[in-house]
Amino acid sequence: MNAAYAKAADANVLTIIKGGKKERTNSALKSDGKPKATAADPIRDIADVHELQNYFREKGQLRNYLLVTLGISFALRAGDLLSIRLMDVYGANWEVKKEFYLYEDKTNKRNRIHINSVSKQALEEYRGMIKAEKPDTTPLFTSRKRDADGKCRAITIQQLNHILAEARKEIGIEDHISSHTFRKTHAYHMIKESNYDSQVLYALQHGFNHSDIRVTMIYSGIEDDMVDEVKERMGSLLI
């Protein structure tokens, strides 16, 4: 039986009615089936990703370099990325772990995070800047500001957005980037590099908790590219 779509009370949630029962699901589509407006793009040109990484490294801002590297590699929501602690990624002797587990704040889903070779190298480089005596519950991405008890606290999503906005302006990246950009960039390049492989699409859909693959295509920005390509082909037919 085809699903009928009804307007949800929460504009960010799509309510699907199947067999008389309502199911709520996170979706990149509005209740009328049209894409939601988005405040962030993926970084489509991998050269821009490298330029963003190098921008922070050359300024000696290894925390921000690590944010970009892990943000795109791990494909976590910004809140989950900023919740990572030293003890999550470093072992007792400060060795970088191969993987760790994290409960997603939005879904409470237990997520296994693989630390790839580039992320490992970035974590090893960043390790020299850490002042903690041992890997503990200190946030990995610490702010200069302290909490009410004088303890280190993580940077906020607002601070992350400001950091990225300033870098975008300096570098001249055309894509609009914000805290959502990391996940979208991960999905965009995974799909492109795989040549739209169905297994990759399914893995991304499952990992992002999307209701179907088209939602993932919209979220990643791939569908926009496909529409642009079709329009370009149409243009080639005209005189």
Regions found by a protein language model. Give the residues of each.
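Short hydrophobic short-linear motifs embedded
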Residues: 1-29
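Short, polar N-cap/turn motifs at the start of nucleic acid-interacting alpha helices
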Residues: 89-93, 197-220
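C-terminal catalytic core of Y-nucleophile DNA break-rejoin enzymes
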Residues: 105-124, 137-165
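Basic, Lys/Arg- and aromatic-enriched nucleic-acid-binding interface segment
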Residues: 46-74, 196
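Catalytic-site neighborhood detector that most strongly recognizes the C-terminal catalytic loop/helix
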Residues: 104, 208-233
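Short pre-functional
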Residues: 65-79, 101, 188-193
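C-terminal catalytic core of tyrosine-transesterase DNA break-rejoin enzymes
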Residues: 73, 185-208
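Conserved tyrosine-mediated DNA breakage-rejoining catalytic core shared by Y-recombinases
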Residues: 2, 84-119
